[in-house]
Amino acid sequence: MGVVAGTGADISLLPRDPIVRRFVSRGRLVAIPARLSKRRLVLDWLAQEFEPGQVYPEAVVNRMLGRFHPDFAALRRYLVDEGFMERRQGFYWRAGGTFDV
């Protein structure tokens, strides 16, 4: 795995999932869903911003997630807690979620 310092994969501004679309306007999250099932769908959409096999410093993860919502720390924590990303010593990498092939 290589460490990257840039931005991510540029996920679509309009999510495919109709539930996720309810929480997104102009490519940004208008709210973080409280219901776990809906939050997982949103997290899956966000996880696609991160390239599989790449390692990201925390500052880059913060910047990438900050493009979607001001509470990037909560999003980062949720991504790790729900298994979409893993973390070790300030570095993050994608560990799950939907992959486009």
Question: What does each model-found stretch correspond to?
Answer:
Residues 1, 91-101:
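Short, cationic-aromatic polyanion-contact patches
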Residues 81-92:
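A short, conserved structural fragment
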Residues 68-78:
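Short amphipathic alpha-helical interaction segments
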Residues 44-47, 62, 66:
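Amphipathic alpha-helical segments within well-ordered protein domains
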Residues 13-50:
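Short alpha-helical segments that sit at the start of domains
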Residues 52-65:
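Short acidic, hydrophobic short linear motifs in intrinsically disordered regions
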Residues 1-14:
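N-terminal regulatory modules of eukaryotic gene-expression and nucleic-acid-associated proteins
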